[in-house]
């Protein structure tokens, strides 16, 4: 098995593709409909650049900042994202990693872990809600997040229902039960060598 440490998102994506069932990876990596917004978002990173000032004597250097009153060690927030249950600890693992680096956790409404659990793992958690349902339903979601210790709300206004994919949406189980295990078994067995290698490394 390769070193558990990796330095880039591209390497994380390569490892995920090797280990996950094809349908799960396909749902994780693809955008809605033609995927135009996803491609535009990725392309926007190519338009950004850094011009570091390495010369000169600046006494205090730091990337820390504040967002909604929360202190960040660097200007990064974990975006609220679904499908994190591809890891057994799901959002809890991500929340702990973010807390370890001093950055907030954005928790999706479609998370596999509760806002109570995640807010306990990361004291700077922002809860994401969709602008759907009636006023009372929205108020209940906000109040639950507040009571759980969430420090802010991320409101998604441009999506309120499931969009299809032009290439077809893969089947993703809502829970891993016997039926789901049987259905995903062929895809898992196709990656059995990778899984056995990882299991052996954990046993030694």
Map each language-model feature to its residues.
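N-terminal capping/small domains of soluble enzymes
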Residues: 1-147, 153
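Alpha-helix-loop-beta-strand connector modules within alpha/beta enzyme cores
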Residues: 118-126, 175-188
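Residue-level detector of intrinsically disordered/flexible regions characterized by low predicted structural confidence
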Residues: 153, 177-181, 200-202
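Conserved protein kinase catalytic core
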Residues: 86, 162-164, 204
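Single conserved hydrophobic/aromatic residue that forms the stacking wall/gate
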Residues: 194-204
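Glycine-rich beta-alpha junction loops
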Residues: 157-161
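Glycine/aspartate-rich loop-and-adjacent alpha/beta segment that forms the canonical ThDP
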Residues: 164-178
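Short glycine/proline- and acidic residue-enriched helix-loop micro-motifs
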Residues: 24, 28, 188, 193
């Amino acid at each position: 098995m390769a070193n558990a440490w990796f330095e880039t998102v591209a390497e994380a994506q390569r490892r995920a593709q090797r280990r996950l069932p094809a349908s799960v990876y396909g749902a994780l990596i693809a955008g809605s409909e033609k995927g135009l917004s996803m491609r535009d978002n990725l392309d926007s990173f190519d338009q950004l650049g850094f011009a570091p000032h390495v010369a000169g004597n600046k006494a205090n250097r730091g990337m820390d900042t504040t967002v909604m009153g929360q202190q960040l060690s660097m200007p990064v927030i974990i975006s609220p994202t679904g499908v994190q249950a591809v890891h057994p600890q799901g959002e809890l693992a991500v929340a702990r990693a973010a807390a370890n680096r001093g950055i907030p956790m954005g928790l999706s409404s479609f998370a596999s872990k509760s806002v109570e659990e995640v807010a306990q793992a990361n004291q700077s958690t922002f809860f994401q809600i969709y602008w759907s349902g009636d006023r009372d339903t929205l108020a209940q979601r906000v109040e639950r997040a507040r009571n759980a210790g969430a420090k802010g709300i991320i409101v998604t206004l441009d999506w309120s229902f499931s969009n299809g994919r032009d290439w077809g949406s893969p089947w993703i189980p809502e829970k891993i039960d016997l039926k789901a295990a049987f259905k995903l078994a062929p895809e898992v067995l196709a990656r059995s060598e990778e899984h056995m290698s990882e299991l052996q490394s954990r046993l030694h």
